[in-house]
């Protein structure tokens, strides 16, 4: 009898683990990844991820953070009402000359796994950036 009760308890706990709500069930982000393209060193690019509450209840963003200190997401301080879209500002420092890929995490109240989005690009030294821009032509604008 103890084995049956133990098995039933384990089974119910397993079902509960699979029934966890996911971030994708309550929010929709306009894009999973934003590519800044080429950016000028020490000119921090900014992107605004759009987060929409697709549930029927307010969504609380407990925290936002990035995979390193060179990337700064703003905090979302107010609950997101059902059907409402808010913007999450993400800024990259652009201090180091190199390609970059950085993850940004969005932790929602009541959901264990945070939602992740990503920014990518390549930082060029100022002279190299200006040369690249001239080669692209005056008609084209950088992405950032």
Outline where the language-model segments fall.
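Asparagine-centered strand-capping/turn motif at beta-strand->loop junctions
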Residues: 51-55
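Beta-strand-rich extracellular modules
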Residues: 93, 107-111
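Long, low-complexity ectodomains and other extracytoplasmic segments of secretory-pathway proteins
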Residues: 20-43, 50, 111-144
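Bacterial Sec-dependent N-terminal signal peptides
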Residues: 1-24
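Short, solvent-exposed loop/turn segments enriched in Ser/Thr/Gly
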Residues: 42-48, 95-103
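Short strand-edge motifs at loop-to-beta-strand transitions and within beta-strands
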Residues: 34, 84-90
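Surface-exposed binding patches on compact interaction domains or structured appendages
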Residues: 56-84
């Amino acid at each position: 009898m103890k084995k049956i009760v133990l098995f039933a308890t384990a089974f119910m706990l397993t079902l509960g683990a699979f029934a966890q709500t996911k971030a994708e069930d309550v929010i929709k982000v306009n894009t999973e990844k934003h590519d800044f393209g080429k950016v000028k060193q020490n000119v921090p690019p900014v992107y605004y991820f759009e987060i929409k509450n697709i549930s029927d209840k307010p969504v609380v963003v407990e925290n936002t953070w990035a995979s390193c200190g060179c990337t700064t997401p703003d905090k979302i301080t107010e609950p997101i009402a059902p059907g409402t879209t808010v913007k999450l500002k993400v800024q990259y420092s652009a201090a180091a000359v190199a390609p970059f890929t950085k993850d940004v995490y969005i932790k929602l109240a009541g959901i264990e796994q945070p939602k992740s989005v990503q920014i990518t690009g390549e930082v060029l030294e100022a002279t190299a950036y200006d040369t690249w821009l001239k080669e692209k032509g005056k008609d084209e604008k950088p992405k950032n």
